[in-house]
Amino acid sequence: MPSQPFQDDGVVLETARPKVKPPKRYQVVLLNDDFTPMDFVVDVLTRFFGMDEAKANAVMLAVHTKGKGTCGVYSREVAEMKVMQVNQYAREHQHPLQCEMEVV
């Protein structure tokens, strides 16, 4: 491809290079509450986020001690789906566990 702009009858055409930003990423977080059992939180982390038992326990303890814990970082659509799935699963099992997403 020539480095010179294309010229024809005094008209100069230049190739526009759009500035494309990478899409935003979202972290999915679980919020602590005083009623959801710790083993249910571990179940959620293994079931919906594919964590092994050790990682799920570490995140569960972060939720318990710090008030919230990060489950993963995803595109907007994936994060929205995971939040919806976790919140629905918690309600079906009559737990007040809350899951949210935050821009990274």
From Swiss-Prot:
Organism: Hydrogenovibrio crunogenus (strain DSM 25203 / XCL-2)
Record-linked PANTHER family: ATP-DEPENDENT CLP PROTEASE ADAPTER PROTEIN CLPS, ATP-DEPENDENT CLP PROTEASE ADAPTER PROTEIN CLPS1, CHLOROPLASTIC
Coiled coil: none
Biological function: Involved in the modulation of the specificity of the ClpAP-mediated ATP-dependent protein degradation.
Family from the record: Belongs to the ClpS family.
Pfam family of the protein (one): ClpS
Protein name: ATP-dependent Clp protease adapter protein ClpS
InterPro entries for this protein: ClpS, ClpS_core, Ribosomal_bL12_C/ClpS-like
GO biological process entries: protein catabolic process; proteolysis
Subunit structure comment from the entry: Binds to the N-terminal domain of the chaperone ClpA.
